[in-house]
Amino acid sequence: MDLTYFGHSTFQIETEDVTLLFDPFFEENPHTETDPGTLAPDVLLITHAHFDHFSDVEAVLEASDPLVISNFEITQYVQEEYGHDAIQPLNEGGSVEFDWGYVESTHARHSSSFPDGSYGGVPNGFVLELGDDVVYNTGDTAPFAEMKWVGDLWDVDVMLAPVGNVFTMGIYGALHSTEMVEPELVIPLHYDTFPPLETDLDAFEDAFDEAGYDTRVFGAGETAAL
């Protein structure tokens, strides 16, 4: 599979069977000049409703017709506000199988509200089985004990986790989460987008290397095979 990182928590995964876009944040994202209208994902996954994960949902929907997977409140909002009927509500612990893979919604310790301040439902992460690969996007979160269940139930190949601190866990919270999940590779998200999220990536890499975990820091716009 190929992963493209657009900065912050926005990334795309492409396999032979499907293209998945996560948490579309482009227009106000200082790390990318990508026009969301140029993307054509088959599936759009949204972890929660905060503006830095949701603000370009409408632009993506106008350009393509993806299946939207998210919590009940977000999928209802997408249907009612944008007139988009290709939705799959998926609350925490729920799962759905598709011909291209499997998606399960996981807990995330965070908050969620739409840009207008209305309730955005419960935030989530996602575990995805894509062929032989298992991907865990934690979503915006702090460490929580049930992360160990993810590690017990799946052999996670790639874990994507926030490291920017302040609004989510920082480097050492992400390391503690990694110790529970035991993935093959960790990719950092949610850093250096705004001044409160300035992150020492050398410290991130050093801490994980010392603990024996492989990491990969993507440049914004970078695509790599994983």
UniProtKB/Swiss-Prot annotation:
Protein species of origin: Salinibacter ruber (strain DSM 13855 / M31)
Record keywords: Hydrolase
Record carries keyword Hydrolase: yes
Coiled coil residues, start to end: none
InterPro entries, sorted: Metallo-B-lactamas, RibonucZ/Hydroxyglut_hydro, UPF0173, UPF0173_UPF0282_UlaG_hydrolase
Molecular function terms, GO-annotated: hydrolase activity
UniProt xrefs under SUPFAM superfamilies: Metallo-hydrolase/oxidoreductase
Protein name, as recorded: UPF0173 metal-dependent hydrolase SRU_1937
Gene3D superfamilies: Ribonuclease Z/Hydroxyacylglutathione hydrolase-like (3.60.15.10)
Record family assignment: Belongs to the UPF0173 family.
